[in-house]
C-alpha cells in the first residue's frame, strides 16, 4: 500500500462514518443536509442505486428515482459531510454492476427483482 492510500484510509477512519453495505439494484434512502440561507434541514432522497464507484475517499454512487413522472439521477460522494445517513430499504437482485439501461425503461419494465435472504438448509441427522 502506498503513502496516498494509507493517508486515505486514515482519513476514512477519522471521519467515522457508518456506511451500510449496498450494491447496484438496492433501494436506498439518502439523508442529505440542505442549507437554505441560515436554516439547515435534512432532506431524504429515495431511489435505486444504478452505479457505484469504489475509489477509497473518492467513492461515489448514483441514485435514480422517478419524480413527477420524470427520471431524476443524483450522484453522491460516499464520504461527503453533506450526507447525514444512508439506509437500505430493499435489496435488488441484478446481474450488472451498472444499471444504466434503466434510463431507457419506465413502468413495469424498470422493476427490479428483490433479493431474498438465503434459506438455511437442514441437514439430515445420521
From Swiss-Prot:
What Gene3D superfamilies does this protein map onto?
Answer: 2.30.30.790
GO MF term set? structural constituent of ribosome
Q: Name one GO cellular component term.
A: cytosolic large ribosomal subunit
Question: Which GO terms of type biological process are on file?
Answer: translation
Listed Pfam families: Ribosomal_L19
Query: Which UniProt keyword terms apply here?
Result: Ribonucleoprotein, Ribosomal protein
Superkingdom, natural source: Bacteria
Q: Which family does it belong to?
A: Belongs to the bacterial ribosomal protein bL19 family.
Give the NCBIfam families listed for this entry: rplS_bact (TIGR01024)
Role description: This protein is located at the 30S-50S ribosomal subunit interface and may play a role in the structure and function of the aminoacyl-tRNA binding site.
The name of this protein is Large ribosomal subunit protein bL19
Provide the gene name from the record: rplS
Amino acid at each position: 500500500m502506498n503513502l496516498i492510500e494509507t493517508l486515505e484510509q486514515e482519513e476514512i477512519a477519522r471521519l467515522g462514518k457508518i456506511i451500510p453495505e449496498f450494491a447496484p439494484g438496492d433501494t436506498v434512502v439518502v439523508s442529505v443536509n440542505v442549507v437554505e440561507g441560515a436554516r439547515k434541514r435534512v432532506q431524504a432522497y429515495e431511489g435505486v442505486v444504478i452505479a457505484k464507484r469504489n475509489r477509497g475517499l473518492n467513492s461515489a454512487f448514483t441514485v435514480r428515482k422517478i419524480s413527477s413522472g420524470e427520471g431524476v439521477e443524483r450522484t453522491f460522494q460516499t464520504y461527503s459531510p453533506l450526507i447525514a445517513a444512508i439506509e437500505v430499504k430493499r435489496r435488488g437482485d441484478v446481474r450488472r454492476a451498472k444499471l444504466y439501461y434503466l434510463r431507457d425503461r419506465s413502468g413495469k419494465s424498470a422493476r427490479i427483482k428483490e433479493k431474498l435472504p438465503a434459506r438455511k438448509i437442514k441437514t439430515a441427522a445420521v
